């Protein structure tokens, strides 16, 4: 009898436990918090910034902070964050300078190239400078996952034509430097076969060896820096200016500069649908 009572008690306890069990709600994944939200305001230029983000996945920001500017996954003593600083853009000038930047930078490259090579963020700012010397200013700098453009302020209106040309030249040069620093620089194989990088160069022989910069001819990592020096030259000079200088037979005595020039131009036209010489020919588009 005692055994039967115990069995009945156990059964009642089981029923009680089952009756009290709560039904758990289905688990749903939590929403991912996006670091930057666009638009940042309601200016007439904000839709253009949203469109750029949708096309390329890059955040063009006129509101940002010191962490956005200087963050780097690896601390380096005396590195970017300890060397440079900048201020956020004057919002009254963002529309004007953005239009200038689009015409003189982004419009020269294919959408596919920009999507693959633009940084995670482009910071629109002003007073881009060295921390140790406020008078040492820059128009563009890049770091880790960002490019910062300066003169989004009244300084833009104060620029001379020559200064605007330098501004544009620096954008293209730094863009390719950024691509190189990310390990994504695409150098045609044929380009690296023209110059013998083991041959010592001098101030009187570097042109004949196929260099366009004597400084590069003396540095390490010659192939990458040689290619970047060609890019900087091509995108900053008209074809007529190049024909009258480094492509002139009395300068390019070995014909190697012209050979390397042609390799770059044809490669980027064929593979990326980008006419690098057209950038140099365009000069400044206001």
Feature-to-residue mapping (PLM):
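Bacterial N-terminal signal peptides that target proteins for export
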Residues: 1-8
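C-terminal motif of bacterial Sec signal peptides marking the signal peptidase cleavage site
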Residues: 15-19
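Acidic/polar, low-complexity intrinsically disordered N-terminal segments immediately downstream
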Residues: 21-111, 244, 250-286
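Solvent-exposed, acidic/flexible segments
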Residues: 87-98, 142, 160-169
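Auxiliary, metal-adjacent structural segments of Zn-dependent hydrolase domains
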Residues: 91-145
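Structural recognition of the beta-strand scaffold that forms the well-ordered cores
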Residues: 123, 146-150, 229
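Active-site recognition of the HExxH zinc-binding catalytic motif
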Residues: 147-195
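Metalloprotease/metallohydrolase-associated module, dominated by Zn2+-dependent proteases
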Residues: 195-286
């Amino acid at each position: 009898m005692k055994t039967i009572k115990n069995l009945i008690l156990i059964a009642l306890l089981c029923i009680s436990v089952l009756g009290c069990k709560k039904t758990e709600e289905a688990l749903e994944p939590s929403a991912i918090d996006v670091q930057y939200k666009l638009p940042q305001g309601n200016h007439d230029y904000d839709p253009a910034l949203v469109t750029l983000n949708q096309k390329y996945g890059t955040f063009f920001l006129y509101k940002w902070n010191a962490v956005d500017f200087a963050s780097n996954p690896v601390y380096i003593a005396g590195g970017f964050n300890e060397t440079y600083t900048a201020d956020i853009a004057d919002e009254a000038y963002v529309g004007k300078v953005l239009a200038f930047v689009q015409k003189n930078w982004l419009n020269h490259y294919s959408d596919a190239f920009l999507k693959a090579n633009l940084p995670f963020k482009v910071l629109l700012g002003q007073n881009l400078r060295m921390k140790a010397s406020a008078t040492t200013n820059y128009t563009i700098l890049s770091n880790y996952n960002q490019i910062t453009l300066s003169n989004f302020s009244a300084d833009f209106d104060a620029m001379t034509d020559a200064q605007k040309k330098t501004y544009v030249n620096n954008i293209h040069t730094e863009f390719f430097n950024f691509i190189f620093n990310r390990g994504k620089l695409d150098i045609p194989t044929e380009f690296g076969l023209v110059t013998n990088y083991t041959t010592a160069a001098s101030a009187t022989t570097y042109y004949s060896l196929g260099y366009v910069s004597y400084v590069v001819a003396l540095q390490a990592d010659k192939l990458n820096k040689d290619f970047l020096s060609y890019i900087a030259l091509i995108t900053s000079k008209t074809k007529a200016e190049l024909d009258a200088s480094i492509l002139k037979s009395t300068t390019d005595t070995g014909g190697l500069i012209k050979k390397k020039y042609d390799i770059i131009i044809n490669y980027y036209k064929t593979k990326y649908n980008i006419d690098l010489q057209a950038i140099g020919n365009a000069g400044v588009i206001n």
